[in-house]
Amino acid sequence: MSKFPRKETLLEVYEWRMKQSAEDIAFKMNDDEMTYKEYDRRANIIANGIFKEGCNPNSRIAVLAKNSVDYAEIQYGTIKSRTVLVGLNWRLAGPEVVFVVNDSESELLFVGPDFYPLIESIQDQFTHVKKIIAMGDHETWESYDSWKSKFDDSDPKLKGENDDDVIQLYTSGTTGLPKGARLTNKNILASTPMVEETWGKDWNERSVNFVLSPLFHIAGSNIIIMGIVFGCKNVVIPEPDPTKILELINTEKIETAFMVPALIQFLLNHPNCGNTDFSSLRQIVYGASPISEDTLLKAMDVMGCEFWQVYGLTETSGIGTTLAPEFHDPEKGKLRSCGQAYTGVDIRIVDTDGTECKQGDVGEIQIKSDVIMKGYWKRDEANTESIVDEWFFTGDAGFFDEDGFLFIHDRVKDMIISGGENIYPAEVENALMSHPDIIDAAVVGVPDDKWGETVKAFVTLSEDKNHSEADIISYSKEQIASYKCPTSVDFINDIPRNPSGKILRRVLREPFWEEKGRKVS
């Protein structure tokens, strides 16, 4: 029997949860706690404020802030107002933030104190923003607390639709421009029973859920939504700080958390790891990038809890496959697999000519399910290319073994995953090519013990021009987010290309992956 009712909208499920768990703790951050009843009341205030600012259902509301209970309030407020939350990646550079805010046509922008200088420097470039609200004190912008004080806490009582957009998360594109993936009530509610049958099967109103993944990321968004739906106590930290994470696992008796492999590695290497009591942990859900077998086995030994691997994309609501704890036994030979499809998810492997591959043959991974996004925001051509007959083309290449377990082999679209962040070569190459002395450039992902992969650039300079590796890296950091920037640069005379001019990334990548067994980390 399901732990929550089947409804048409996420709002209806939330409203049911608020009544079921009214006096239970919904959130804890530092020493502050908030009940589900208070969470519901504050979301009413946010929703009413959104309307008073002239926004309407389907308006986009952007947030550039680190994790906080205020962020969670805004998320619920957008749900109550039938507006759409646009979580901004706070690692983006100024021009990238401008693009996403304008592309999404966001009408309100909530900004955390860490990002005041950034927004001050670019606010004149916003085309649709009616108001900027400071999530703290600011000389010019109205503060979040002051803004909220003007509105009542009456329930807007809007009835949403199953096909309403709920969140719009931006994922980088092969053209170098991010695309907004539109996730609806239908998508999110399709994923909840899948979670309930797998890594959420033991979640309940007494569970302590750790919200440490950024809320602009599909993993962070999913974890907080599921934590609320299941009625957990959700412990929030601004960002994944290893010292704080280990401390809170002890003091808050954390039971479940999602972590990217790089964070797991940081925790294992932290000097406080050996003194941390992990006995409260029931499970770690991990994904967003590959993990080495050595790291995984050490983590299982040190933390002593169940491990669930998940594979999914922003466009699939973070849902695709999961590798259950019983298959984390090295003797079963599945540790390098990302698992089996959730119930309600169809996966096929397709060759370049469109035919379905035989077992063991590598092809593009395609997914069909109600979790597939409605589409990219105002990207008709990209939608036509990425979703055909309800099948989503992931751009990842993989194969099924004889037991139906999916193995990721390579990336059709050349995407690099570094520390759980998706990086597209085109974005980095566009930034490099803006340098006046660079006449050609290509980037690939190469192995990195800490991040899984890291960006390596190959650059051809104009004749008689000289620059150091440090010069190029420094320049790229002025153009794009630092996590996308090259960590190493090779200067070469010619970038290898095929007759049609396409960069031969495999030629550049191959020497670095020869000993790794597969061509992604």
Write out the residue ranges for each language-model feature.
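Conserved AMP-binding/adenylate-forming core of the ANL superfamily
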Residues: 2, 6, 23-68, 72-76, ...
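Conserved pre-ATP/AMP-binding loop-to-beta segment of ANL
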Residues: 22-23, 152-170, 177, 201-208
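Conserved AMP-binding A3 loop
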Residues: 35-38, 166-193
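AMP-binding/adenylate-forming catalytic core of the ANL superfamily
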Residues: 71, 92, 98, 109-111, ...
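ANL superfamily adenylate-forming
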Residues: 116-162, 177, 270
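Conserved AMP-binding/adenylation subdomain of ANL enzymes
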Residues: 189-208, 216-255, 270
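Gly/Ser/Thr-rich phosphate-binding loop
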Residues: 229, 254-259, 268-332, 346
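Conserved ATP/PPi-binding loop(s) of AMP-dependent carboxylate-activating enzymes
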Residues: 340-344, 353-385, 421-423
